[in-house]
Amino acid sequence: MSFYLDLATRLCILAIAAVGLNLILGYGGMISFGHAAYLGLGAYAVGIPAHHWLYGGLDFLATTNGFVHILIAIAISGLFALLTGLICLKTKGVYFIMITMAFSQMAYYLFVSIEEYGGDDGLVINTRSEIPLINLDDPIQMFLVSFSSLIFFMWLVYLITKSNFGLILSGIKDNEARMVSLGYNVYFHKLIAFIFSGIICGFAGVLLGNFTTFISPEMIDWSRSGELMFMVILGGCLLYTSDAADDR
């Protein structure tokens, strides 16, 4: 029973990351091989504060408060997505793919080089995030939190795809030149989608860090991005059909 529960929990967590990637891949046509970076940053947002809470050092980071972990993950993954997006989105096609992968590998080698957090061997998290009324040490509650989060982000992405922003994003994917001629700021819309996609993956990383109680640079490696890509492609890039698509 515990095996299937753990499997279901892991699937829910990775599905959240896939939903985030799908926002830019399925609806924006942006093929990113760097989204594992945001997943890993979210996991490290749990592991690093917990490590300092247990063993000291960097007192301003030392905490097991789950809400603080989530805020750190959102801030770090959002900022990294902003910085990488500003550069990556100036390119297209294979160049975009390679640059997103390059940024992911930069983050990978950064954490490999930090011996305090385990380097290449990773870091065991001896305590999970603490959230009022929720015990993440309980496998059933861990699954329920992961499943509820998946439903929430699916609903949120659904709202985005049905909004004017989502329709513009779909239009950019279908015919970017036409959207430019209509006066839309294509770069801005793609950047906002890219940032939001990274934040969703960062939140998934918080859950993944709590689930595995272990973080390592392997979470950031480009091969993990490839796994997320396959999940999106096999599951169907367009989770929701936009109204514009219905009209066609």
What does each model-identified segment do?
Residues 1-243, 248:
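Transmembrane alpha-helices and adjacent helix-loop boundaries
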